Amino acid sequence: MILRLSSVLLFSCLLVVSNARVLNNAQLKPVPVSNAFDPECNMDVPEIINRWGYPAEEISVVTEDNYILTMHRIPYGRDGPSPNRPVIFLQHGLEDSRFIFADAGFDVYLGNMRGNLYSRDHTRLDPKSHEFWDFSFDEMVKYDLDAQVNEALKRSNQSSLYYVGHSQGTLTMFSKLSRDPIFHRKVEFRHQKVLCVGASTVKHIKGMLQVLAEFLFDEVKFFYWLFGDGEFIPTNKLFNLIAEYVCESKQGTAFCDNLLTLIMGVDSNQINATRNDVYFTHIPAGTSTKNVIHWASVLNVQMVRSGILREYDYGWSNEKYYGRNEPPVYDVSQDQCEIYLFWCPDDWLADEADIEGYLIPALKKQYVVKNTKLEDFNHIDFLWGMRAADEVYKPILDAITDDLKKQTNPLD
């Protein structure tokens, strides 16, 4: 279904409402930028990687339910190829971290879940069909992680890897480890680590998405009517127009900064505003309306209202899908691997109340090796923030390096 004009108008109205509601929490202000066009606006991921002097590969993998996913790989850094490079799997992106890890000697894989701009194909279904988009992050947990991790290990001839997740990439791994012991054993090694940034439940979300939840999400049918039952806000529609005609101009920079603030959290002054046009031409990366409903919690028993991480709620049809009235819960207390958490109080999509009130108490204490609370970060700063390299990526690299040393010298 084509994005309805009413949904665009409603999006604009909600932006105004959100702006008014969060002004007490965030000062929205313009940042001077250059009008120069950045060529990365029209590049795909491999082209951007090549532009910075790194090799890039595209790898297709078919899931058990026949979705065709595309991973991106940086097999080595500027030092050139070498054998037996440890594998690190990034879900999703984490911007410049891919180059930091490649230069540090890692074989870097960038995952793309179904519905993402690079993972919208199927052996049988037409990507334009409603059937193709009939998924939420449940299917990513069940099928996509298996397919991508297995392929990365196979290609690199390794038996284990390091996983670094952000946002949905963290939530899906937590869910996978809680549910699938075979997968857990498959990737487990003596010092297994999952390094996670910016994710939890979304009961205490703030900003524009909170407004959407309050105003729209009591009626599933209305939400589907508004946005369709296929792809949620196609990537090359609204946001590309904003990037092309607004973010490049000095006058429009404030609008783009404010839009990020209203969604992601208080402006931390970490974003390089000269790259706003690049950021907005590559977001949103694409997903289904059903996945947004799962995240935003349309039904009263979904995550926003309950604060519990569970599978998609089909309402009266739960009995049909699950054989029970309530959807199954992802019990993260079953996760049994070393976990390194990086989070921040100003992240409106992974709120402090959700992190400290649900996630940390739910995880077993012996597995939470490091719990890092960052100040003056918001949700998007983990990817694009100018302090992310020093305060997030390098500590992650240090943790992995220490682990590799312990594997080489088990008595250390």
Per-segment meaning from a language model:
Residues 367-412:
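Catalytic active-site module of serine/aspartate enzymes centered on a nucleophile-bearing elbow/loop
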Residues 348-354:
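Conserved alpha/beta-hydrolase "acid-adjacent" motif
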Residues 130-155:
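Alpha/beta-hydrolase active-site loop
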Residues 2-20:
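Cleavable N-terminal signal peptides of Sec/SRP-targeted secreted and luminal proteins
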Residues 335, 341-343, 347:
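Short beta-strand/loop motif that positions the catalytic acidic residue
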Residues 164-169:
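Gly/Ala-rich beta-loop-alpha elbow adjacent to hydrolase catalytic centers
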